[in-house]
């Protein structure tokens, strides 16, 4: 497997010699190769978006979006016919607001906010007339879950709250004006989730079983829950009830039982008759578009190489065909008014960030509203290429390759010459990489690196067989898939064996640690962002409200409650092999991470120090599972950029002022990254929760 890498390296050296016959010269560095391409500032890529999450209120009265107020993201509204008359309606001064939605109550919107990344999200209602915000879940250590909104009851909302029992959410009907809550369901039955009809009657529920499967329950005539359906463990990530139409007559159900990829079915509530809505042999069904007045599904997305919308209701076929034909990139429908006359749509291409439009259905007109990141317009962004890579046991790994301009002059997705590569590993791991604009992909390509994002086994979206193939394979075949993808890139001439870094967050951080401990010669360096180092301590410290998911974790990873499981998890933990690390490692961690606790990073750093192995450890005291504050994200990426430049030879924008406003601290290894120690000397830490 190493011979192709050797030949590619030799070829590059030979070409360099042939072009300069009088004196042997080293092959140009990644920075030299891309020197003629404009360097895109980190602030343009990772600073606050100018406008994002654009929506329209159900009554069509307002446009809304998130944008910065004094550098902090807040919710803004404007008259739908006059976006220039915008005003901020929230006043967050710390982490910012990213998740919000409209209620059906006129002049009322809702948003979610946690503290310092602790993921104890509270739900707030904002009265647009008075500007007052009310915490609808004013209880400590409570994580709100929105369980239902209904146009039939615009003044109330269903909310799950775990203030009584941290593990399980009780269901309340909450009055938006007063904040008063009425208990609808005390969750003594360990229910993982509920489905309510438009009158807020709880009709269906799902409960996890000790075998890792789940029971779907239905409310019986006597008011008690009774078993409605059975989901085996192997189907539980790809099978679940979705929701009811507004008349309560149809239940939508995503189902992989008796098949590989998940299909969408419609179930007649009265008769139990199941009707296939959509299936695809390549990939699981994804998101849906539903009629806002009836809840009837009208289109279903399927994402194999790229996301495609499949129309199942002719009423919107012409609309989607028109929108897809206009471009640029792939279209998504953000929100629709209740009368369905107006849609807010967004277009995204790999080489262009989101652009938002207003679509008037009756006139058939599309009006541009905003670009999420106008600073990137005209910048040298590059395409992304979907590829299918065969693993060593012949599984198909849908992956995405991004090439720097210096390596793909004719823009055909084929490397002209090998360049350093960053293997960018997604988190989850029960998630997936998809085609589209990615700030990290563009940033790394602009610095001179190829970027490869791989859907390794265990990823979701490609059928249950592919997902279940990852069971018990942390640091096993899941990691083999990443190694196989790198070998593919070497054989394709994208890179050479000695020029590959591994980087990722969450599971991607674990994959980075695995790469440097289980295969210590495979990568030139690694960047671990909030990755677990010890699978036993990871599983013993998950949030209490993950109780309904824990049996799945135990079956897919290893059971820390048994001796055999503990042994297995120890064997698959990078901490166990920390003494094998021989390549440079950068670690980033949020101190308030509720999923991957700070101890996960602390303990591997301590183990490396005990063996005198260098490491650079960056810690943010006001972050959780990832870096939400743009100041912190930019700060960490500034460190990462210098780290990768030292390791792979790409170019690096100086740290400059990118620590300003951040809470960055570097407990260990500040001298391991060029310019880091000096930048810290003049930095004043700003902690905002």
UniProtKB/Swiss-Prot annotation:
Subunit structure: Monomer.
Keyword Signal: yes
Swiss-Prot/TrEMBL keywords: Aminopeptidase, Hydrolase, Protease, Serine protease, Signal
Domain of life the protein comes from: Bacteria
UniProt GO BP: proteolysis involved in protein catabolic process
EC number: 3.4.14.-
Activity-pH dependence: Optimum pH is 8.5 to 9.0 for the hydrolysis of Gly-Phe-pNA.
Transmembrane segment boundaries: none
SUPFAM superfamilies: alpha/beta-Hydrolases, DPP6 N-terminal domain-like
Main function: Exopeptidase that catalyzes the removal of dipeptide units (NH2-P2-P1- or -P1'-P2'-COOH) from the free amino or carboxy termini. Prefers substrates composed of bulky, hydrophobic amino acids at P1 and P1' positions. Has endopeptidase activity on N-terminally blocked peptide derivatives which contain aromatic amino acid residue at the P1 position. Exopeptidase activity is much higher than its endopeptidase activity.
The family this protein is said to belong to: Belongs to the peptidase S9C family.
GO molecular function: aminopeptidase activity; dipeptidyl-peptidase activity; endopeptidase activity; serine-type endopeptidase activity
InterPro entries for the chain: 6-blade_b-propeller_TolB-like, AB_hydrolase_fold, Peptidase_S9_cat
Active-site feature positions: 506, 593, 625
Pfam families linked: Peptidase_S9
Signal peptide: 1-26
UniProt key word Protease: yes
Temperature dependence: Optimum temperature is between 35 and 40 degrees Celsius for the hydrolysis of Gly-Phe-pNA. Stable at a temperature below 20 degrees Celsius for 30 minutes.
Regulation: Strongly inhibited by the serine protease inhibitor diisopropyl fluorophosphate (DFP), chymostatin, leupeptin, 0.5 mM ZnCl(2), 10 mM o-phenanthlorine and N-tosyl-L-phenyl-alanyl chloromethyl ketone (TPCK), but not by N-tosyl-L-lysyl chloromethyl ketone (TLCK). Activity is not affected significantly by iodoacetate (IAA), L-trans-epoxysuccinyl-leucylamido(4-guanido)butane (E64), pepstatin A and phenylmethanesulfonyl fluoride (PMSF). Activity is stimulated by addition of 0.5 mM CaCl(2), 10 mM EDTA and N-ethylmaleimide (NEM).
Name of the molecule in the record: Dipeptidyl aminopeptidase BIII
Gene3D superfamilies: alpha/beta hydrolase, TolB, C-terminal domain
